[in-house]
Swiss-Prot record:
Protein name stated in the entry: 3-isopropylmalate dehydratase large subunit
Residues making up the signal peptide according to the UniProt record: none
Record's keyword terms, sorted: 4Fe-4S, Amino-acid biosynthesis, Branched-chain amino acid biosynthesis, Iron, Iron-sulfur, Leucine biosynthesis, Lyase, Metal-binding, Plasmid
Family, similarity comment: Belongs to the aconitase/IPM isomerase family. LeuC type 1 subfamily.
Pathway linked to the protein: Amino-acid biosynthesis; L-leucine biosynthesis; L-leucine from 3-methyl-2-oxobutanoate: step 2/4
Length: 471
């Protein structure tokens, strides 16, 4: 039988399998952060258990951290408790921790790949839904719950049902100013937030092949917003070039052996997929979400749809509810929407290529005085903040009026100091826009880094026309 990439990785990690039942899979890499791990470690202590493979377990602080200070007290008492507990847990169980004093500290789904922890063919888990990001390297990666975190800590295995295979081929010649974020938002808009439920999605096609690793990570990161368990892109020369020489990547003769194996991690011709889709993105424009779900998305030059556009009564009611919450009227143009804040960051779009693309838009420009704009590099001295400062990107952002912050999840979620106030509207490069995601009453519009940068005049602007716009 011809196997898909997913089936190859799944089968290679089976520890135990019973007919018509879930398999027990070996887990190659377990990533932790301060929010979803404390209860798991407490349970280990109560049951007098140890971590089976501490060298295959890595932790970082990202969700709760202050992005204005490295002071553990800066994010409030609850955040401090969670971070202190993570320090205690990692010390007791001999787990490597990227804490606030570690210059390599950053967002978990940024530091994993940049340090070479993430490798093709691996199984990777984390107590975070956007673990699908690592699938960009041809790794089977997915988010898990706290009870599963405990199970992996103790056994280095996890019970998993086989999932269905979905293939999404992306073809066409991308126009200027259209990004990976636009492509994946467009696909989510077509398939819906449950379109990938029960599936592992493999992305392929000429457009994917031409993407750099940062762009591929954006695509796989957002696959979870289609309801998919995981996403995969077959490793190729782009993957190998990114990984070579990184701290935890194989070295010397082991590198050559690894690449030889990684080249076998492709879906065989005529392998079976339960569903297949092909999208031509040749005529795609920059995308922006208008509602409270990632699939409520339009091209920047379109109008908010009339409720009668939706034939399905559920979608019609959701659209009406979204417009009420977002304070938008059907028939209004997206370019008429005024914003209060700009956020460039998150595990979706805080990597060096994201910063470079936004900096090109912002060079020699100034944000409006009524706008607050913050930029969050995804990591410290790894591949983002320090390299960006060496290139002078920080100066471009600061000169434009942005706050150049420390690594962390920040305004992606209303869990730290960086929140929207009630009624505030944000152009955000994050991944979720449900009610209150960025703060109670906050209104989130998901966009690419360059579209976020183009919103500097206090409203959404088609980045392709930015030079013709004025304050």
């Amino acid at each position: 039988m011809k196997k898909t990439l997913y089936e190859k990785i799944y089968d290679a990690h089976i520890v135990h399998e019973e007919k018509n039942n879930a398999s027990i899979l070996y887990i190659d890499l377990h990533l932790l952060h301060e929010v979803t791990s404390p209860q798991a470690f407490d349970s280990l202590r109560i049951k007098n258990r140890v971590v089976r493979q501490p060298k295959k377990t890595f932790a970082t602080m990202d969700h709760n951290v202050s992005t204005e200070s490295k002071d553990i007290n800066a994010s409030g008492s609850m955040a401090k408790i969670q971070m202190q507990q993570l320090i205690r847990n990692c010390n007791q169980f001999n787990i490597s921790l990227y804490d606030l004093n570690n210059p390599k500290q950053g967002i978990v789904h940024v530091i994993g790949p940049e340090q070479g922890m993430t490798l093709p063919g691996m199984t990777i888990v984390c107590g975070d839904s956007h673990t699908s990001t690592h699938g960009a390297f041809g790794a089977l990666s997915f988010g898990i719950g706290t009870s599963e975190v405990e199970h992996v800590l103790v056994t280095q295995t996890l019970k998993q049902q086989r999932l269905k295979n979905m293939k999404i081929q992306i073809k066409g010649k991308i126009k200027n100013f259209v990004t990976a974020k636009d492509i994946i938002l467009f696909i989510i808009g077509k398939l819906g937030t449950s379109g990938g439920s029960g599936y592992v999605i493999e992305f392929c096609g000429d457009v994917i092949k031409k993407m750099n690793m940062e762009e591929r990570m954006t695509v796989c990161n957002m696959a979870i917003e289609m309801g998919a368990k995981s996403a995969l892109i077959a490793p190729d020369e782009t993957t190998f070039l990114y990984l070579k020489g990184r701290r935890y990547s194989p070295q010397g003769k082991f590198w050559e052996e690894a690449v030889k194996y990684w080249k076998t991690l492709i879906t065989r011709s005529k392998a079976f997929f339960d569903k297949e889709f092909t999208f031509d993105v040749s005529n795609l424009s920059p995308q922006i979400t208008w509602g409270t779900s990632p699939d409520q998305v339009l091209s920047i030059n379109e109008k908010i749809p009339d409720f009668n556009f939706f034939k399905d009564s559920v979608k019609k009611n959701l659209a009406r509810s979204a417009c009420d919450y977002m304070n938008l009227k059907p028939g209004s143009y997206l370019t008429d929407i005024k914003i209060d804040k700009v956020f460039i960051g998150s595990c979706t779009n805080s990597r060096i290529e994201d910063l470079r693309s936004a900096a090109k838009i912002l060079k020699n420009k100034k944000i409006s005085k009524n706008i607050k704009a913050i930029l969050l590099p995804g990591s410290g001295t790894g591949t983002v903040k320090k390299p960006a400062e060496k290139e002078g990107l920080d100066k471009i952002f600061i000169d434009a009026g942005f706050e150049w912050r420390l690594p962390g999840c920040s305004m992606c979620l209303g869990m730290n100091n960086d929140k929207l106030s009630d009624g505030e509207r944000c152009a955000s490069t994050s991944n979720r826009n449900f009610e209150g995601r960025q703060g109670r009453g906050g209104r989130t519009h998901l966009v690419s880094p360059i579209m976020a940068a183009a919103a500097i005049y206090g409203r959404f602007i088609d980045v392709r026309n930015l030079d013709s716009e004025t304050n």
